[in-house]
Curated annotation (Swiss-Prot):
Protein name from the UniProt record: Nucleotide-binding protein Ppro_0977
Organism: Pelobacter propionicus (strain DSM 2379 / NBRC 103807 / OttBd1)
GO molecular function, one term: GTP binding
Domain of life: Bacteria
Family, per entry: Belongs to the RapZ-like family.
Biological role stated in the UniProt entry: Displays ATPase and GTPase activities.
HAMAP family with a match to the protein in the record: RapZ_like
Length: 287
């Protein structure tokens, strides 16, 4: 029988995942004591009901579960059951924002801040996270996107699903994009803003782009930046990310960041075909 354990951080989207799997025909149960789990699996098998499998939800509330899961899972695997562990995570900033929006108390402790509760929860779930067969980062997902991803995974449709990479140029004077996973500051590069004939243009114009990219300082930077992305992008994919935002900023978001963002997108498309590019502040920088 297929057994999926849904676990992870509070506020990461476990309830969304469970609802998706329930609609998909799985029998879902929340925080079943570990000593009852093996008898429960046997009971479902003997019932003859046509469930696609069992989903067990485990989180920080199930102290008994967290103590006994390792031996139980291994026993079930030895009996021929397919046991998968989906650990759903999100960045601390995203979790704090979600708790703020819902006005819920963090379940880790009665009296502590949300950020402290998140720290405690990460410590308690660290072993389970290491055991996970799938780590899913929901930081960049809305409810519908997370549900779609969970269904693709359980249907075996996600193996060929590439990570969507968004390259976003921006101006620091207008703020760093909140959705950023990686932020690169290129304000140290030569600035066309101070060249009268180039100032009215943007990083999309050939003359402006050549002024930036042909500079030796830019060449040295890209020789370091691109190999770094060759390491970072696959690492984010392995951590369960299906969306990655790489934000590149200069002062106004019109010249340097645009040119470097275009060069970065061109470089990454060789290995990651789903690269898209957005120039958030290119028109603001004209003002």
């Amino acid at each position: 029988m297929r057994i999926i354990v849904i676990t992870g951080m509070s506020g990461s989207g476990k309830s969304t995942a469970v609802r998706a799997l329930e609609d998909e025909g799985f029998y879902c149960i929340d925080n079943l004591p570990m000593r009852l789990f093996r008898p429960f699996v046997e009971l479902i098998e003997k019932s003859g009901d046509s469930y696609r499998g069992i989903v067990l939800v485990a989180d920080i509330r199930g102290r008994e579960f967290l103590k006994g899961f390792e031996n139980t899972f291994q026993t079930l695997r030895d009996q021929g059951h397919g046991v998968e562990i989906f650990f759903i995570d999100a960045s601390d900033d995203v979790l704090i924002r979600r708790f703020s929006e819902t006005r819920r108390r963090h379940p880790a402790e009665e009296q502590c801040t949300v950020s402290e509760g998140i720290r405690i929860e990460r410590e308690r779930l660290s072993t389970l996270r290491q055991m996970a067969t799938r780590i899913i980062d929901s930081s960049d997902f809305n409810v519908h996107q997370l549900k779609e991803l969970i269904l693709r995974i359980v249907r075996g449709e996600d193996a060929e699903t590439p990570m969507v990479i968004e390259i976003k140029s921006f101006g620091f004077r207008y703020g760093i994009p909140l959705e950023s996973s990686i932020v690169m500051d290129v304000r140290f590069l030569p600035n066309p803003f101070f060249v009268p004939r180039l100032k009215p243009g943007s990083g999309l114009d050939d003359e402006v782009r050549e002024y930036i990219l042909d500079n030796p300082k830019t060449a040295t930077f890209l020789d370091c930046f691109f190999p770094m992305l060759d390491m970072l992008v696959p690492a984010h994919r392995q951590e369960g990310k299906y969306y990655l935002t790489i934000s590149i900023g200069c002062t106004g978001g019109r010249h340097r960041s645009v040119a470097i963002a275009e060069a970065t997108a061109m470089y990454l498309r060789a290995d990651w075909p789903t690269v898209r590019i957005t120039h958030r502040d290119i028109e603001k920088g004209q003002q």
